[in-house]
Amino acid sequence: VHRLEGGAEDHATPKLPAHSRHGPAPSRDSLRGLDWFVFFMADVQTGFGPFVSVYLTTQAWTQVDIGLVLTVGSLIALAGQMPGGAVVDAARSERLVAACGVIAISASAFALAAWPIFLLVLLGRVLHAAASCVLGPAMAAISLGLVGHAGIGERLGRNARFASIGTGLAAAAMGALGYLTSSRYVFFATAALIVPTLIALFRIRPGEIDPERAHGGKHDAGLRKLGEGLLALAGNRPLLILAACALFFHLANAAMLPLMGSLLTTRSSDWATVLIAACIVVPQLVVAAFSPWVGRQAQQWGRRPLLLVGFAALPLRGVLFGAVTDPFLLVGVQLLDGISAAMLGVLVPLVIADATRGTGRFNLAQGIVGSAVGIGASLSTTLAGYASDTLGSSAAFFGLAALGFAGLILVWTSLPETRPDAVD
């Protein structure tokens, strides 16, 4: 076995966490299975990004109907965060929950491609949103159940790397597929990805997922204690502060790229598509490169120093977006988005795991923070759009930067260091 605290990372083969009191280290087969499950899940979720509105437009849908379907999906995703986490906490098998979620998303993609009528598409979006609410917590629970707190930092970093690579490759492949054939085949391809996704999932050996570690402690097997769990978490100060910090971060962050995309279109219409694509790809490259390092350093340095770096990059990015006029330099500014994404993508679930250790409510807590993220992101685009229309795009970016700075101050002044002195 390898020590998690030092040494060069083996990029080809996941490291085995040290033997813990809960049982032996997970097998390489399980760890590789988790790598590829994360990768293919990112592929599947990418199929439901901007391709939905493009496809429905080609099917002669009105913008009102498209907007309604997307809004319903967003509302279900927001409302389902806490119930989704509670379902994973109550489940006896995280693999089974994840498999059901994958099947639901695949069915949704197939229905969307085969029968693009309003009712079926609406039901498909609801199904996809509900499945997504359990897949995120299930993936984190499987990770924690396999490696425990001793290895969760590096494991989350590895998850972020594979998710980032999967997202980037899937966006390129599905964009090419839609261009060469039609956007309908993007969703048939998404549905077909159920096969490698489930193969990867079932490479993870169920006996190696420690149920107590997966839930952050001993957990009730039913949903009847959901109220008790919520009350207990309502008194968890680090968790609530983290949720507030996440709300401020996404209140500032969610509107930045769409607003900048509009700005690029007006300043450089000929290059707009290429520049926007570059603004999406550049952060993914940063996340893929640095996420494992973030996971390792979080075990050595603690969570707060790295979180402060991730939060500090956001207001700096907002100020630069408001001040820089060269459209090509704006792509370079997106490197800061990659830094924030690498830091928060690893550290937010890591702090949740720290804060809920021993409670058995790790996944419900993920739902609470996920709800805060959803609220912040939902309000962000509305506030930024209003500010841009009334005060101008530069003022909107400076306003978003101020909100991001408020999140940074909250982390600096209120969020405690959660790294445990002794890990299992």
Task: Tell me the role of every PLM-derived stretch.
Residues 68-86, 281-293:
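Central cavity-lining transmembrane alpha-helices of secondary-active solute carriers
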Residues 361-389:
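A late C-terminal transmembrane helix in Major Facilitator Superfamily
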Residues 23-74, 240-241, 245, 250-264:
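Helix-loop boundary and gating motifs at the non-cytosolic
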Residues 15-31, 207-242:
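Juxtamembrane intracellular "pre-TM" segments in multi-pass secondary transporters
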Residues 80-93, 178, 290-302:
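Helix-to-loop junctions at the C-terminal end of transmembrane segments
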Residues 185-202, 397-412:
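Symmetry-related core transmembrane helices of the 12-TM Major Facilitator Superfamily/SLC fold
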Residues 96-110, 305-320:
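Structural signature of the two symmetry-related core transmembrane helices
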Residues 124-164, 351, 358:
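Cytoplasmic helix-loop-helix junction between adjacent transmembrane helices
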